[in-house]
A protein has these predicted regions:
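ATP-dependent adenylation/nucleotidyltransferase module used to activate substrates
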Residues: 1-119, 160, 175, 191-206, ...
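A short, flexible beta-alpha/helix-coil linker loop
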Residues: 39, 138-140, 182-184
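Generic alpha-helical secondary structure
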Residues: 60, 144-151, 189-193
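Mid-to-C-terminal catalytic subdomains of enzymes
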Residues: 104, 108, 114-158, 162-167
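C-terminal boundary motif of the adenylate-forming
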Residues: 162-171, 211-215
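C-terminal, charge/polar-rich interaction regions
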Residues: 166, 185-188, 195
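A short interface-forming secondary-structure element
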Residues: 172-189
Length: 217
């Protein structure tokens, strides 16, 4: 049986935990839920350029300390070929801990993984990319629970309006909204953006702008 390890903390969107539970059941995996405390990691909270490296290393070291791995099991990571061409400091931690990356090793791209997932009737085949909420905080601005909660609330507001794959990036008390390129026209409609902006400001933000480039999923 395949065992899935999931690090649970405030850094993941609330719906992510439900998705993990559902997906592991669907695939017949045994799920290990590991609670982590990233706000106690000083190098993570400092939010320097190496934040992801320290976070990833802490998480995988915690996984590898589990008796399941001490007995000889191998830890696999979901890195794909597209990730290798991006700035991902966490990949250094993966390498240092000898975590295996089979999808990247065989050269699978994100698109190819989606196609194969669809062939195998996996419900996640068209799932929008998700990432740690800490990535939304401007570099070198300390990461706090309050900021992470604010990001989560803002993104939930957008999702309730039907926008998927959103990112709300914070810099001090200002927010930049990034939606999928196909959704830009809808969000740029004055009544829609005005309503969302008012919702954001009611949460304590002072400025709200839209990323005019949008984002690819």
């Amino acid at each position: 049986m395949v065992h899935a390890f999931h690090a649970r903390s405030e850094l993941l969107p609330p719906l992510e935990a439900e998705r993990v539970d559902r997906t592991t059941q669907e695939c017949g995996c045994f799920l290990h839920l590991i609670e982590i405390a990233p706000f106690s990691w000083h190098k993570f909270v400092a939010n320097g350029a190496d934040r992801c490296y320290h976070c990833k290393k802490k998480i995988y070291q915690t996984f590898l300390a589990d008796p399941f791995f001490i007995k000889g099991a191998v830890l696999f990571d979901g890195t794909n070929r597209d990730d290798l061409g991006q700035d991902r400091p966490g990949l250094l931690a993966v390498s240092e801990l000898n975590v295996q990356t089979p999808l990247a090793d065989v050269g699978f791209t994100k698109k190819e993984i989606r196609l194969l997932s669809r062939e195998f009737s996996l419900s996640t085949w068209d799932l929008h990319a998700s990432s740690c909420l800490a990535t939304r905080i401007a570099p070198r601005e300390p990461i706090t629970r309050e900021k992470i909660l604010l990001v989560s609330q803002c993104e939930a507001l957008l999702q309730k309006r039907g926008f998927k794959g959103v990112r709300v990036r914070l810099s001090e008390e200002n927010a930049t909204i990034a939606v999928l390129q196909k959704d830009l026209c809808e969000l740029q409609k004055k009544p829609v953006f005005s309503d969302i902006k008012n919702g954001f400001m009611s949460l304590g933000l002072r400025g709200v702008v839209l990323d005019p480039q949008g984002r690819l999923d």
